[in-house]
Amino acid sequence: MIIELIRADITSLKIDAIVNPRPTGGDVGTATVSSGGNVLCKFVITAVVPRAGEESEERKLRDAIFAALHRAEELAISSVAFPAFAGAAARVVLRAALDFRAHARSLQRVVFCAFNEEMHREFGRVLQELEAS
């Protein structure tokens, strides 16, 4: 499974599914699937993420990323895109994606979309650090 970082509008990607992280809409750490609607992807995976400062925030965020990636596997799709997360969350979501590699079967490509150059650089730096460790 390849992990990529790009600077783009996530809704413009030709990808099987995009992940919509939300702090509401179910139990934190879970994920649901709906159709792609008016975007180019086939599916939207909504991952329920913790609110900033919530108890056990890092573990819950990791659980939400894993849940979204497991949903992608259940759909037997090959690609999924996440919006890039800012700050300390970047390390958590990238570590979760790297750790998920051992579980990937159909999923071949995970893309993180940064919306600005600063976030793109920060995510790239964190990804390099994690891949080197």
Protein language model regions, located:
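Glycine-/small-residue-enriched capping loops at alpha/beta junctions
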Residues: M1-L75
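Phosphate/ribose-phosphate-bearing ligand recognition and processing surfaces
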Residues: R51-S133
